[in-house]
Amino acid sequence: MFLLDHDRAGGYWGAVYTFCAVKGLQVVIDGPVGCENLPVTSVLHYTDGLPPHELPIVVTGLGDAELGREGTEGAMSRAWKTLDPLLPSVVVTGSIAEMIGGGVTPQGTNLQRFLARTIDEDQWQCADRAMTWLFTEYGMTKGRMPGERMRPDGAKPRVNILGPMYGAFNMASDLHEIRRLVEGIGAEVNMVFPLGTHLSEVRNLVNADVNVVMYREFGRNLAEILGKPYLQAPIGLESTTKFLRSLGELLGLDPEPFIEREKHATLKPLWDLWRSVTQDFFATASFGICATETYARGIKAYLEGDLGLPCAFAVARKAGEKTKSDEVRGLIRQTRPLVVFGSINEKIYLAETKAGHGPAASFVPASFPGAAIRRATGTPFMGYMGSVYLLQEICNGLFDALFNILPLASEMDSAAATPATLRRDMPWDADAQAALDRIVSQHPVLTRISAAKSLRDAAEKAALDQGAERVVLEMVEALGDATMDRKGGN
């Protein structure tokens, strides 16, 4: 089966999400008719939950004439005239425009060109360059760093949060949590960049004492250029504590009082969940994750390292590296984790496993692509609040797995009539029983009883249908092969 499921977008998507997050900057997408449908309509309007016309975006809408004869300048001039001529504007090239040499800014406009390199860069690589470009173009003066405004005596230390932008999974909640942690130890947030920053304020990035980079996929290059110490936003219990202590050391603040308060307040539900009746399943509640490196690496370290839950697989989507989706699909089929964190791709692969015997795993959105709106700030993955939320999702996943075992009345009523009831005393060959045990062992411990009953009934029914007096190895192997075929789509 040929499999090529994309797990990221091209470069100009990352540029659009970066530039649209900045106030005072207008964006022109140089591309063919309909090129805005996916990055703008499906993501900004649906996933990010922004109404149409909320952001100053126009498209050149290249047709056959522009692509084959006239070029893109005329279309770009028409697009620019629909914008405010007094505000700065940037042209972002799509792959089609790049192939025909588009993106050339017409005379008499204030358009600046940003080459997205859509053909050879993904959205995260381009977003990293776009963040740096904003600072070098609007923060620096002729290549010189702006002067730093000294902090008044007695003022709180200042911290930048780099990376929040549109098109980033769970951004609102994680930004809210990182801001809460920074302010909790006594610092103040100097700027969140690029989200919500006005173009005239970009130069103020140099006024921070420390930078926090939200994502591993983009933002680190800008942090290097700013020349201040920077930390990676944390996921998990131990990681968050280390982050707060490192941040406190860099800023000259004592984070211990805040950490102690968090143990008795924010983290109280975590201790309760850990000591609740669900603890009986934690040692065998396996999980799998396929997400951006930020979340795949952080969630694995937390659930496996801090809590001791078995990790069936962890696949990180890294900037500039292709993810082997067929391998991810195979891992879900082979390891059968109880909870799967991922994108719409993994949700589809997980749905395929429902064709086999036994209950299906539960799915938790943890990455784009996928239709998951996360505008509310109550679903963090980062920080202490994220630690509580993730464990809560694991517990809910356990309950979902148990729910999937329950027989539905409609399914029971629709069962095909059988000429005879299954014989509970039907003998089994030893090798057939061993094969059944091997297949059942691939299921999570929590759901093995249900899977074993389902497989045993199917094997005995196959024996009765064939007029056999006992269950033999070939009957069980046929069930296993059929299950793999249905799950694999072969």
Curated annotation (Swiss-Prot):
Annotated GO MF terms: oxidoreductase activity, acting on iron-sulfur proteins as donors
Enzyme class of the recorded protein, top EC level: oxidoreductase
Transmembrane annotation, as ranges: none
InterPro entries: BchZ, ChlB/BchB/BchZ, LI-POR_suB-like_C, Nase/OxRdtase_comp1, Protochlorophyllide_Rdtase
Any matching Pfam family: Oxidored_nitro
UniProt entry tagged with the keyword Aminoacyl-tRNA synthetase: no
Signal peptide (residue range): none
Gene Ontology biological-process entries: bacteriochlorophyll biosynthetic process; photosynthesis
Catalytic activity: 3-deacetyl-3-vinylbacteriochlorophyllide a + 2 oxidized [2Fe-2S]-[ferredoxin] + ADP + phosphate = chlorophyllide a + 2 reduced [2Fe-2S]-[ferredoxin] + ATP + H2O + H(+); bacteriochlorophyllide a + 2 oxidized [2Fe-2S]-[ferredoxin] + ADP + phosphate = 3-acetyl-3-devinylchlorophyllide a + 2 reduced [2Fe-2S]-[ferredoxin] + ATP + H2O + H(+); 3-deacetyl-3-(1-hydroxyethyl)bacteriochlorophyllide a + 2 oxidized [2Fe-2S]-[ferredoxin] + ADP + phosphate = 3-devinyl-3-(1-hydroxyethyl)chlorophyllide a + 2 reduced [2Fe-2S]-[ferredoxin] + ATP + H2O + H(+)
The keyword Aminoacyl-tRNA synthetase belongs to this UniProt entry's keyword annotation: no
UniProt keyword terms in alphabetical order: Bacteriochlorophyll biosynthesis, Chlorophyll biosynthesis, Oxidoreductase, Photosynthesis
EC number(s) from the headed UniProt entry: 1.3.7.15
PANTHER family: LIGHT-INDEPENDENT PROTOCHLOROPHYLLIDE REDUCTASE SUBUNIT B
Family from the record: Belongs to the ChlB/BchB/BchZ family.
Oligomer status and interactors: Chlorophyllide reductase is composed of three subunits; BchX, BchY and BchZ. Forms a heterodimer of one BchY and one BchZ subunit.
UniProt protein name: Chlorophyllide reductase subunit Z
Underlying gene: bchZ
